[in-house]
Amino acid sequence: MDSYFKAAVSGLDKLLDDFEQNPDKQDYLPDAYAFNQCSVSSESASPQLALLSKDQRCISTCASSEACCEDANETFLEGKIHEGLTSRPNEKNVAGLDLLSSVDASTSDEIQPSCMRRCSKPVCDLISDMGNLVHATNSEEDIKQLLPDDPKSSADTLITLDSSSVSEALTVSSVDCGSNAVREEQNNINAGIKNRDISIKELGVKVDMALFDSCKYNRTENLKDKIISNELETVDFDMPSVLMEQSSEMSNTKDNPQYKRLPCELLKDDGCLAEEKVAVAVNNTECLEEGGGSNTIAMPCKLPENEGISPSDPASKDENFKLPDFPLQENRTSVFMKQTVKEDSRNLDLKDNNDIVHVSGDDVPPSLSCLSLSGSLCGSLIHNNEHSDILPPNESEGQNNDAVTIHEEIQKSDVLDGETDLSKKETCRSIFLQPVNEKKGEGKVEVEEMVISGESLESPEDASSAAAAGSPVALSAASVPEAPGPCEGLTFPSSDMDGQELDYFNIDESMRSGILISDAELDAFLKEQCLSNSNTMSAGENVNDSQLQMNQITMKGLHDENAGDIYFNAEAGAAGENGGVGNCETSDKENTENNGLSIGEKGAIPTERELSACQPDIRDELPVPSIKTQAVGGARPKQLLSLPPGTRSSKELNKPDVVDVPESEPCTANATAVSTCSADHIPDSQVSFNSNYIDIESNFEDGSSFVTANKDSLPENKRKESLVLGQKQPTWVPDSEAPNCMNCQVKFTFTKRRHHCRACGKVFCGVCCNRKCKLQYLEKEARVCVICYETINKAQAFERMMSPGGSCLKSNHSNECATDQPLQETQTSSTPSPTTLPISALKQPNVEGPCSKEQKRVWFADGILPNGEVADTTKLSSGSKRCSDDFSPVLPDVPTMINKVDRTHSPTVEKPNNGLGDIIRSEISQSPTCHTAPVERLPGNTGTEGLPMPGPFTLEDDVFVDSEEPSTPTVVPANSGLPVASISDYRLLCSVAKCVCNNISLLPDDDIGLPPLLATSGEDGSVPVVQERPSHEQIILLLEGEGFPPATFVLNANLLVNVKLVLYSSEKYWYFSTNGLHGLGQAEIIVLLQCLPNEDTVPKDIFRLFITIYKDALKGKYIENLDNLTFTESFLNSKDHGGFLFITPTFQNLDGLPVPRSPFLCGILIQKLEIPWAKVFPMRLMLRLGAEYKAYPAPLTSVRGRKPLFGEIGHTIMNLLVDLRNYQYTLHNIDQLLIHMEMGKSCIKIPRKKYSDVMKVIHSSNEHVISIGASFSTEADSHLVCVQSDGVYQTQANSATGQPRKVTGASFVVFNGALKTSSGFLAKSSIVEDGLMVQITPETMEGLRLALREQKDFRIQCGKVDAVDLREYVDICWVDSEERKNKGVISSVDGMSVEGFPSEKIKLETDFETEEKTVKCTEVFYFLKDQDISILSSSYQFAKEIAVACSAALCPHLRTLKSNRMNKIGLRVSIDTDMVEFQAGCEGQLLPQHYLNDLDSALIPVIHGGTSNSSLPLEIELAFFILENLSE
């Protein structure tokens, strides 16, 4: 076995010598994939090693062997770290013997990691760790200079390969968690730099060393008391600017030849260099109590098993690094495995380094640093989700996803050797390096400045936290000739970034609540967009729960001449780039366990920071493009990066919290990003995105460059990108090539039909293609997708703004198209985009189809018939359908976030998750061309409803995870900080459920105790507080104080009562109003109860009344207008109080009263003797009360202790019409039937739609008498009133205005057919009590019955036969009366008034409920096209079926909906012969798209099944309420 390693070492020596002697001959070398990896995964060991070149496979094998062979030998280094050491791997590809397979020929190599199948130590680490830390320089003398002065340490820490001295640069930064200062220790061995005397506690660092010459892999040596020169720099985050500069002048000047030539330097044809410097993140895995902190020290030979990497840019301002001219692929994943820490030994066990460097070039094998990502990517910080194949699942939960962020997490978990005594958990946050200004010139890119911000978090018990930030430098901004560019990068002080962190790492849930990211940071990532003319390499592969994914970054073809000023403002959340010809596509995804990042064809991925911290909520499987990549020479990919077509599984895990940036945050020139997309280079394959992968096809044409976009370039690019849409007919994508929506990926089914966008020609679903826009080539409006619609509108709006004449911009046809929008902050956005509101999931009518067939009665909006044929849509009409756009409100209360992407629509919605305040973001894109655009979040506040309440969102019906305990910075918890818009707002109940128990009555059993008090100031942002058992004195002080809002009592979790002392009609009254009865289908109740003199206690019996009403409503017994509720016991300390009569206020004065939302009723206290009239003829009692208290038609006040207005039943006509004893029968009352009496004539107006009620009266009445009760007429100016005096019933009139009466209303009419012809009268009409009596002959009665049956008008002449001039007339008229129900009621869907539309209660056989909550459908509104059309029984049955289906669809989401203040939901369904659609909303705002998707699946079968049984057109709206389950 030793011979193999010796042979490998010998071969490596020759390669290094040859490289040094012939550095210029590498221009013709073939492509190579240079990996450096120590695999501990059960699947990735052999495949990944196969990708390595021969020398690096030897490195990996040696590292694994060393880890297996050594068990007890440890090397301790006390003192300071060597920094500045450089090492270089051999960049040549060596084809030859696979050393790993030769050393161990067992068949389990493919599935067993090398260190696991041998022993717990690596076989050899003399070379493997060298690949981790590559510092590319251009000076051969630097090798010798960088060697440590101390020969012993040099011999033990560095591996000398003959004359080729390979050293490693190791940068370790220590974060002082107490002061949030980052102490960066950098070791420069050679230079005579002055050292700072900083004492550091001794740390035992286990260093596995290998004797190179003898290849004995068990050599260890203790290095003690080695004082090595180093530098320590501290970053103070409180300073306005934090520029970390190396004090090492030798690495910052051009004069020093230290970085002139190293073997890993890449010399290209033009002599340019690709240089990178590496920093290694070292986990602080040890806590030392001494000194309050400790520093973790790592030797170059082995790297700790860390969760992330900390790359940095070159340490010299003049050190030039540039991207090669040829297409360059860089795929790297640095994974530092977690390590086992034994606190008692204070030893840092440095496990194998799992750093994978993937280098590929078409012409020359480039030399790439493992970690210097920002340099190689023009300063763009790469989002690199570090998930290693080689770790068990429990060791990768908190891995760092950002290339410049160090996230340490040491927790108790099983590690490779079974040790489980990890106890500390630390997080070093946001050590953030980024080039802010880069200069271009002579084909070289110089980094001028770097900004670093950091923050350290640690547990209180942690002693220290150490993190490595690789050579974080702030290069001096020396005056350097600047090449002209569109825009120069700006220098942003790190104080702008205090307290922020990159979110590309996974954090334990215990730490997650402290992680806050700026609201603007999602938009701030650098977005570039490009077209690819070659294959895209899809990096990473999915593994199951026993494996974790190896992430790689593939990069192709970045021209160094074009590598230019890309900068990033972390606070303002701005990213800039030049739209120009260069295109770059970037799609940001996040995942905590499986995540990869792939850039194809000259793409650049900037640092991505989520302003909304969106977490993917997407389908489990997504199609993967089949893209193959050839590797020439050396190690071959073995299909690791080029996966076959198939599906990938994605998991949904939590991401960090976010916060919003201040409203005053300035937007700099880089606050906008523009990208152009050339449609000429669209490949056939589509790019698939999911939470694990970002496969980006990009292409830089000649002259393209990465430059920042200035303010002037954005509008011009915007116009050019959008003008192409609609100017000529697009290429029509065949239906056969689009099984899924090309935007949201929804699969097309029988009900989810295809829709072609007339602007881009792609195929979308009805949700993504529901807009209409006028296109030039059609010269008329046509269906377009939401993306094209947005693009065209934005361009036109901008042109109108920029053009003095306001004319639309016109230009020549171009193949460019984009929809990138300027960044708009949440606080400053005022006008939503047309695409920001979710639209109905069903189809829209009047859309031109691709071809035509014969006309059918039912057809889908895209012209497809149910039998699969295509309908001629031009011959069909949509009737009187209202477009769903008409219902779109201006300001959504539940905002959605739309990521406007050209041709691909990536809606995102904030969603609370798992009580940690995570905001879920879903993005699924599939299109040959993809753009990235800033996310625009819309404001959600309407009126005083302060906060935007996010709603869960997803793109698939079957993919959604409800959050159970939402708590986010943007979502106020249910019982804290909830803005109170009004005491009558039904959403106020959302804050109560968690504060009280689930009893149906919270009234204390004693006579004094009051229910809990919900205290709130009533102002926006006030915090409701529930107080148990408030005192009466406290309530009186609260109610009598001026300016105080009503006191709100909690009767149960579903019912509130507002109490206030008011002056009404110059008297003092207790005012009670309920809030919550709407949820049961019951109108809210108000009571104005007379306040007795010196009364200082709240009348508790009113609370009992409301509890009784609530319980009756639960049973389906509702109180409506002129209904009553009676008592059998004493009420309000009086046995004379018999109950309440409830009326609907009409002409009464309600000024100054905090009335609830409509509908509501007013309860009037009645006496026991008045109960019979309240039961059999309540209108008489109501009018009598009005006459008594001089109110018209009735008072709203309840007077205690008054005398009854009616006594014992005397001789009244009602004895003939109603049963005043047993209440067995009563007067038939027809709603909206009015009786108007004027001088000389009377008119009985019967609504035509009440014909069925009239027929019931005729059939139930006897042969000679027809009696009908009337309704109160608001058209009359007075009304007849019956007054009982001394047992005699007399007639009075009560006037509304006090003016002379013209039209007087009556309460009933009686037709008596017993008048004899011999009486000499044609007919007699007279006023009896408060009604009209008409006596007619039997012949006239028959004529009246016939006229009523035939719905014809009928006139009765009254008077004597011979007195023609004195006759009066009684006219029976059928009228088209206007519906006056639902006054003041508005729709929950869009805020539209439903006044005048009929409605009825819905009683479902069963309620849909969970363990805690219930969804209840209470009412259905009928939007009749013709007011005379009566409601058919089939319509009601259809409404019930819809209610059942909707309740079932909403049931799984009840908790989330109510947590987001959506406890009242409206569903509107519209059906016509050629169209079906529905809309769902809450408080006038449409629901998030996810619920529409769920409703789509549930409602479509019911809707299509009901179309054949219902009369069309039909439009109904159902009201749903979410209630708490209460117990008796």
From Swiss-Prot:
<feature type="compositionally biased region" description="Low complexity">
    <location>
        <begin position="821"/>
        <end position="838"/>
    </location>
</feature>
<feature type="modified residue" description="Phosphoserine">
    <location>
        <position position="833"/>
    </location>
</feature>
<feature type="binding site">
    <location>
        <position position="760"/>
    </location>
    <ligand>
        <name>Zn(2+) 2</name>
    </ligand>
</feature>
<keyword id="KW-0472">Membrane</keyword>
<feature type="binding site">
    <location>
        <position position="788"/>
    </location>
    <ligand>
        <name>Zn(2+) 2</name>
    </ligand>
</feature>
<feature type="binding site">
    <location>
        <position position="768"/>
    </location>
    <ligand>
        <name>Zn(2+) 1</name>
    </ligand>
</feature>
<feature type="binding site">
    <location>
        <position position="744"/>
    </location>
    <ligand>
        <name>Zn(2+) 1</name>
    </ligand>
</feature>
<feature type="modified residue" description="Phosphoserine">
    <location>
        <position position="884"/>
    </location>
</feature>
<feature type="zinc finger region" description="FYVE-type">
    <location>
        <begin position="735"/>
        <end position="793"/>
    </location>
</feature>
<dbReference type="InterPro" id="IPR000306">
    <property type="entry name" value="Znf_FYVE"/>
</dbReference>
<feature type="region of interest" description="Disordered">
    <location>
        <begin position="819"/>
        <end position="849"/>
    </location>
</feature>
<keyword id="KW-0597">Phosphoprotein</keyword>
<feature type="region of interest" description="Disordered">
    <location>
        <begin position="629"/>
        <end position="664"/>
    </location>
</feature>
<dbReference type="GO" id="GO:0008270">
    <property type="term" value="F:zinc ion binding"/>
</dbReference>
<dbReference type="InterPro" id="IPR013083">
    <property type="entry name" value="Znf_RING/FYVE/PHD"/>
</dbReference>
<dbReference type="Pfam" id="PF01363">
    <property type="entry name" value="FYVE"/>
</dbReference>
<dbReference type="Pfam" id="PF11979">
    <property type="entry name" value="SARA_C"/>
</dbReference>
<dbReference type="InterPro" id="IPR035438">
    <property type="entry name" value="SARA/endofin"/>
</dbReference>
<keyword id="KW-0967">Endosome</keyword>
<keyword id="KW-0479">Metal-binding</keyword>
<dbReference type="InterPro" id="IPR017455">
    <property type="entry name" value="Znf_FYVE-rel"/>
</dbReference>
<comment type="subunit">
    <text>Interacts (via C-terminus) with TOM1 (via C-terminus); interaction is required to target TOM1 to endosomes. Does not interact with TOM1L1 or TOM1L2.</text>
</comment>
<dbReference type="InterPro" id="IPR022557">
    <property type="entry name" value="SARA-like_C"/>
</dbReference>
<feature type="binding site">
    <location>
        <position position="757"/>
    </location>
    <ligand>
        <name>Zn(2+) 2</name>
    </ligand>
</feature>
<keyword id="KW-0863">Zinc-finger</keyword>
<feature type="modified residue" description="Phosphoserine">
    <location>
        <position position="120"/>
    </location>
</feature>
<dbReference type="GO" id="GO:0031901">
    <property type="term" value="C:early endosome membrane"/>
</dbReference>
<feature type="compositionally biased region" description="Basic and acidic residues">
    <location>
        <begin position="649"/>
        <end position="658"/>
    </location>
</feature>
<feature type="binding site">
    <location>
        <position position="785"/>
    </location>
    <ligand>
        <name>Zn(2+) 2</name>
    </ligand>
</feature>
<comment type="function">
    <text>May be involved in regulating membrane trafficking in the endosomal pathway. Overexpression induces endosome aggregation. Required to target TOM1 to endosomes.</text>
</comment>
<feature type="modified residue" description="Phosphoserine">
    <location>
        <position position="927"/>
    </location>
</feature>
<feature type="modified residue" description="Phosphoserine">
    <location>
        <position position="803"/>
    </location>
</feature>
<keyword id="KW-0963">Cytoplasm</keyword>
<dbReference type="InterPro" id="IPR011011">
    <property type="entry name" value="Znf_FYVE_PHD"/>
</dbReference>
<feature type="binding site">
    <location>
        <position position="741"/>
    </location>
    <ligand>
        <name>Zn(2+) 1</name>
    </ligand>
</feature>
<feature type="region of interest" description="Disordered">
    <location>
        <begin position="928"/>
        <end position="949"/>
    </location>
</feature>
<protein>
    <recommendedName>
        <fullName>Zinc finger FYVE domain-containing protein 16</fullName>
    </recommendedName>
</protein>
<keyword id="KW-0862">Zinc</keyword>
<feature type="binding site">
    <location>
        <position position="765"/>
    </location>
    <ligand>
        <name>Zn(2+) 1</name>
    </ligand>
</feature>
